[in-house]
A protein has these predicted regions:
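Surface-exposed, low-hydrophobicity beta-strand/loop segments enriched in small/polar/acidic residues
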Residues: 1-91
Length: 91
């Protein structure tokens, strides 16, 4: 099951029980880093977790997010072509 990540903007309404990605950046060593936030806590002062992903030829690795509050078995993957972050629920 694919869940398109929602980007937070200054005017965006924060919805309870929803997952958001606030920032995606290229970290040291060429790794992609995504910082995920949850619902009403989705502010810069309430970071849920940050996870670096290896820059692989396969278009990015899946990264488990054990600390995210939205759902058990939630993963995200970064699309190397567009930089879009997508959520996947583990089967």
């Amino acid at each position: 099951m694919l869940i398109q990540a929602k980007a937070i903007t200054a005017s965006a309404a924060i919805t309870a029980n929803a997952c958001y990605v606030l920032s995606v950046s290229r970290g040291a060593g060429g790794c992609e880093e995504a910082t995920a936030y949850h619902g009403a806590a989705a502010t810069a002062g309430n970071q849920v977790l940050s996870c670096a992903m290896e820059d692989s030829a396969g278009g990015g690795d899946y990264c488990p997010l054990p600390g995210i509050y939205c759902s058990d078995g939630l993963y995200f993957k970064i699309d190397k072509g567009t930089g879009i972050v997508r959520y996947y629920l583990a089967e």
